[in-house]
Amino acid sequence: MAINVLEVIRQGQVGGGESHLLDLIAGFDNRVNPIVLSFTGGQMIDALTQRGVKCHVVNTSHPFDVRITRQIKELILRENIQLIHAHGSRAASNVAFIARKLHIPMVYTVHGWSFHQDQSFFIKRLRAWSEKIICKLSKEVICVSESNRITGQKTFGLKHSIVIENGINLTKFNPHREFSNLRNEFGFTDEDFVIGFVGRITLQKAPLDFVKSIALARQKDKRIKALLVGQGDMEEETKEAIRLYGMEKHIRTSPFRSDVPDVL
């Protein structure tokens, strides 16, 4: 009989963790019945629904959001969940205490810690403390790199964890297959040297630095142009930066696309 596994993730848009989840679920056999809980809708949820995967969306943008506790608890009981797999700290924070109360084991995959060096001392300590709590409430902690595990050990004494590095979907990213030439679609010539940015347009990805770097690079070589593919909460700021640097003709933008191998 299949195990009912609740895969929890903070957003339904397509990003690194979300792409990982798509590939993870695609690799499950009939011993696992995945059910997805996301805290926003988006392309990932649409793609999983089309595959026949049951998906639930409980809207929130906050970690440790007690307002949705009852709704999540009812969902877990209704779906007879036997294992919870949380991707990222925000997702884990909203299910960790519920999992412990219901005596359901939780696996926490760290797709990068919520604390980093650019935060104030207080915020960084608070985030590290919250990560420590989440890890203590988890049956197992998976780090996607040895670097992440070492950071956890040094920052808050992470004890029980394993490293499972992210892989590449060789069916999708197969260098031996034919790819579409998208240069004409984006207005690039064969002589253009195109630099790509594919990902969420958020602070962590530094899209403003990308725009600035392209402007600086073009001072050295006019063949350099750029393609920026993605969506996020810094879209308008990024478009404004493109205008300020006078890069409208040299940096093309596109929302999320499913044909990333062709784009690359």
How would you label these PLM feature ranges?
Residues 7-11, 15-30, 38-47, 130:
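Short amphipathic alpha-helix
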Residues 15-26, 193, 197-219, 226, ...:
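A conserved mid-protein helix/loop that constitutes part of the nucleotide-sugar donor-binding site
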Residues 43-50, 227-248:
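Short, structured helix-loop element that forms part of the nucleotide-activated donor/catalytic region
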Residues 46-55, 148-171, 175-177:
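Helix-loop-beta element that forms the nucleotide-linked donor phosphate-binding surface
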Residues 66-70, 105, 115-137, 150:
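Nucleotide-sugar donor phosphate/pyrophosphate-binding loop at the beta->alpha transition
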Residues 86-94, 110:
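Short His-centered aromatic/hydrophobic patch
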Residues 174-188, 194:
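A short helix/loop element that forms part of the nucleotide-sugar donor recognition site in Leloir-type
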Residues 234-237, 247-258, 263:
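Active-site donor-binding acidic/aromatic loop of nucleotide-activated sugar
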